[in-house]
């Protein structure tokens, strides 16, 4: 049975939504147990009596806050995220979920759990909604500010494997984010990456930013600098559109009546753009599943992040990524 380590104190709102999300996940899935890392006195009252046999509490009080430096994470061995990562490193857990300091989670996972053989740099992946009934996996969205062509090639392989085995897509199509579809477009790094990716099965060529939300391809590859700007921009646009709609709906009785009639449409729209539906962002390229959740995650987001961790841990992703990198690297050397 899978064991999932949970950083129970790392989120912006304390342990309540994290434990609530864990409880939701445990009630819906009987095939895993959890280790909640955090202050035992705070965590124990939040756990229903009937679920105590499936939740072990690893007691610790130190929490790395969003204001702390990620480089301090290695020194603070009693912190919740350090101990959660160590559980995986020592083989006592199969995956980690944290809504805490993303930089600390990433650096600790990379240095303590270690990179998959053949991976130069891990990448953070996230799902973006599309106008179709599907999502687009985008990576990297923040792990690496600077990436070379080989890094982008590795991101593509990792993203393709994740899409195939964790998201259950048969033959994931990969696109390289650029400022035009022609192979002559892009900067020197993306042009060089295009040459490498052209030898990858399922590579569709360059894609533009708008293609992400059209569902043109299944996986979009970019460096972490561009990816993080893309992610924050998408979040901002979605939030702004929501506020504009809400503001205009209150302007007249007719618009209010129209809103009532379109309630189901608005509900479906909210589901499509709500980050809680997607859970968290997997850190691809390390030897065990690490899911980085939004600091403002509610219980639903944590529940879905745990399900992501379970899917990834059940899919043996690390060995598949290693095999694919060996196979495809032979074609580009």
Curated annotation (Swiss-Prot):
Gene Ontology biological-process annotations: fatty acid biosynthetic process; phospholipid biosynthetic process
Localisation per UniProt entry: Cytoplasm
Chemical reaction(s) catalysed: a fatty acyl-[ACP] + phosphate = an acyl phosphate + holo-[ACP]
EC number(s) per entry: 2.3.1.274
Organism annotation: Aliarcobacter butzleri (strain RM4018)
Gene3D superfamilies documented for this protein: Isopropylmalate Dehydrogenase
Record has Transferase as a keyword: yes
The keyword Cytoplasm is annotated on this UniProt entry: yes
Upper classification of the organism: Bacteria, Pseudomonadati, Campylobacterota, Epsilonproteobacteria, Campylobacterales
Protein known as: Phosphate acyltransferase
């Amino acid at each position: 049975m899978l064991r999932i380590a949970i950083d129970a104190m790392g989120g912006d709102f304390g342990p309540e939504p994290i434990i609530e999300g864990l409880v939701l996940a445990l009630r819906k899935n009987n095939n895993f147990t959890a280790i909640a890392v955090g202050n035992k006195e705070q965590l124990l009252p939040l756990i229903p009596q009937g679920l105590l046999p499936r939740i072990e509490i690893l007691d610790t009080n130190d929490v790395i806050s969003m204001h702390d430096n990620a480089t301090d994470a290695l020194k603070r061995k009693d912190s919740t995220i350090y101990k959660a990562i160590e559980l995986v490193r020592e083989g006592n857990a199969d995956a980690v979920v944290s809504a805490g300091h993303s930089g600390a989670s990433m650096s600790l996972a990379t240095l303590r759990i270690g990179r998959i053989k053949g991976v130069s740099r891990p990448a953070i992946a996230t799902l973006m909604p599309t106008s179709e009934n599907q999502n687009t996996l985008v990576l990297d969205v923040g792990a690496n500010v600077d990436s070379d062509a080989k890094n982008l090639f590795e991101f593509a392989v990792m993203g393709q494997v994740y899409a195939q085995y964790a998201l259950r897509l048969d033959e994931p199509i990969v696109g390289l984010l650029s400022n035009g579809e022609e192979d002559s477009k892009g900067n020197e790094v993306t042009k060089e990456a295009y040459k490498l990716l052209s030898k990858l099965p399922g590579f569709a060529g360059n894609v533009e930013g708008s293609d992400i939300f059209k569902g043109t391809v299944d996986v979009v590859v970019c460096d972490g600098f561009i990816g993080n700007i893309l992610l924050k921009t998408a979040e901002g646009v979605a939030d702004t559109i929501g506020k504009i709609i809400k503001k205009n709906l209150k302007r007249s009785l007719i618009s209010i009546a129209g809103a009532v009639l379109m309630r189901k449409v608005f509900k479906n729209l909210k589901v499509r753009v709500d980050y809680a539906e997607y859970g968290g962002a997997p850190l691809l390229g390390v030897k065990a599943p690490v899911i980085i959740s939004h600091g403002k995650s509610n219980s639903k987001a944590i529940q879905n992040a745990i399900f992501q961790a379970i899917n990834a841990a059940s899919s043996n992703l690390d060995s598949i990524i290693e095999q694919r990198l060996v196979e495809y690297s032979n074609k580009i050397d």
